[in-house]
């Protein structure tokens, strides 16, 4: 397949996407796609899993987000538009992380990317204009913080087209036509999509912008459609049937992968694009996949600086012995359980050492002890590590 899915959501798009990263990667591999772009809502949490499993099955990973885009820090504008942001190279991935971090600092309710943040960290980044809830889409037909959605049958006003042109020019000034694309989606059953795609085709020619096809994937298989309604209803105070009624458009569309290039090209033609426009939009996904060449930065294993030339394993064992000596002074009765104590401690130390976690335990102990010395409250901890003898 020439088509590469760039607009994809997994379970890391919380309460919206369905299917694990691994399920999505396996699905596109079976369909014959050579790459996959994942764009979770406002986070990069799936990227490590994407790289790991994509490499296993021979698929190229593309790292992005579907950002909440718009004014920040304003409670009155909580309905943010959407924007696809992707890393092209190492610098771009660092900038993508900076953008995401700043979005959580600036935002109210949703992690929102401001135009200023996007412009400041634009190097190595490419942008897709977004879905029918994007800034460009909502400028044309309303929605989100730009007012009520307008029916496509009402037409698009000259004023809306002029505003859209100014916003397109802003993106072009920042990214140029090499890094900014108009996103056309594959849903001929949705009137809004048809109206937008037709207008995007006109704007693309006027401003010299390439069209890019997406499937707005939210689940790996078409049969998973019903699960999205369940997920949405669980998130909001509605029943499944109420939610399907209130947002029926989302469940009428197949938010899954096309099974061939012909399928998505036919869908795009069904929205009003010419066949040549549809074919070019599909081919552009492959061009973008070639442009995105990111390998995630790898952290070096934590190594704790030990004393007296000891290894971390030796240091941890010494600390365990010191801890035992401290506790039998506090509670002499424990001395009768010395054999039991050291048998259990030995088992735990072997497991910790085998997993190369000695440095982690030493660093954690150093952090906790330092906090105590500065009269900073430290909780008792939870879980198997906190409850262990070590």
PLM features: residue spans?
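Short conserved micro-motifs on helix faces and helix-strand junctions that flank
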Residues: 4, 37, 86, 213, ...
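Conserved phosphate/anionic-ligand binding catalytic regions in large, soluble enzymes, centered on
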Residues: 92, 130, 212-221, 376-390
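Conserved short loop/turn motifs at secondary-structure junctions
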Residues: 38-44, 184-192, 219, 303-309, ...
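Non-catalytic structural connector segments
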Residues: 1-2, 136-137, 144-147, 269-384
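Extended substrate/RNA-proximal surfaces in nucleic-acid metabolism proteins
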Residues: 1-35, 41-187, 193-207, 225-231, ...
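Phosphate/diphosphate-binding loops
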Residues: 60-74, 79-82, 209-212, 217-224, ...
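Gly/Ser/Thr-rich beta-alpha loop segments that engage phosphate groups in nucleotides
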Residues: 19, 39, 385, 389
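Residue-level "edge-of-site" marker
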Residues: 41, 67, 215-217, 302, ...
């Amino acid at each position: 397949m020439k088509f590469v899915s760039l607009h994809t959501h997994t379970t890391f798009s919380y309460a919206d996407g369905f299917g694990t990263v691994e399920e999505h990667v396996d699905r596109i591999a079976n369909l014959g796609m050579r790459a996959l772009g994942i764009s979770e809502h406002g986070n990069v949490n799936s990227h490590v899993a994407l790289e790991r499993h994509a490499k296993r099955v021979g698929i190229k990973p593309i790292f992005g987000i579907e950002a909440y885009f718009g004014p920040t820090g304003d409670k009155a504008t909580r309905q943010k538009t959407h924007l696809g942001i992707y890393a092209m190279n190492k610098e771009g991935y660092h900038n993508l992380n900076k953008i995401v971090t700043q979005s959580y600092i600036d935002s109210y309710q949703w992690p929102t990317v401001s135009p200023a943040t996007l412009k400041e960290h634009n190097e190595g980044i490419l942008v897709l204009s977004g879905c029918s809830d994007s800034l460009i889409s909502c400028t044309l037909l309303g929605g989100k913080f730009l007012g009520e959605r307008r029916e496509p049958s009402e037409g698009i006003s000259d004023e809306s087209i002029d505003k859209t042109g100014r916003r397109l020019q802003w993106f072009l000034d920042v990214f140029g036509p090499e890094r900014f694309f108009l996103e056309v989606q594959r849903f001929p059953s949705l009137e809004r999509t048809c109206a937008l795609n037709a207008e995007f085709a006109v704007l693309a020619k006027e401003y010299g912008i390439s069209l890019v096809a997406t499937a707005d994937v939210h689940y790996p298989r078409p049969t998973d459609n019903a699960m999205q309604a369940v997920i949405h209803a669980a998130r909001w105070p509605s029943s499944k049937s109420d939610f399907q009624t209130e947002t029926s458009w989302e469940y009428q569309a197949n938010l899954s992968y096309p099974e061939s290039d012909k399928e998505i090209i036919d869908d795009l033609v069904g929205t009003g694009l010419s066949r040549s426009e549809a074919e070019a939009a599909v081919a552009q996904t492959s061009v973008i996949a070639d442009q995105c060449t990111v390998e995630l930065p790898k952290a070096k294993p934590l190594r704790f600086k030990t004393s007296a030339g000891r290894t971390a394993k030796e240091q941890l064992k010494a600390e365990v012995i010191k801890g035992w000596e401290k506790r039998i002074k506090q509670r002499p009765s424990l001395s009768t359980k010395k054999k039991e104590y050291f048998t259990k401690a030995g088992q735990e130390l072997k497991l910790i050492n085998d997993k190369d976690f000695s440095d982690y335990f030493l660093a954690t102990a150093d952090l906790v002890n330092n906090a105590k010395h500065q009269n900073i409250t430290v909780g008792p901890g939870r879980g198997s590590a906190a409850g262990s003898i070590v």
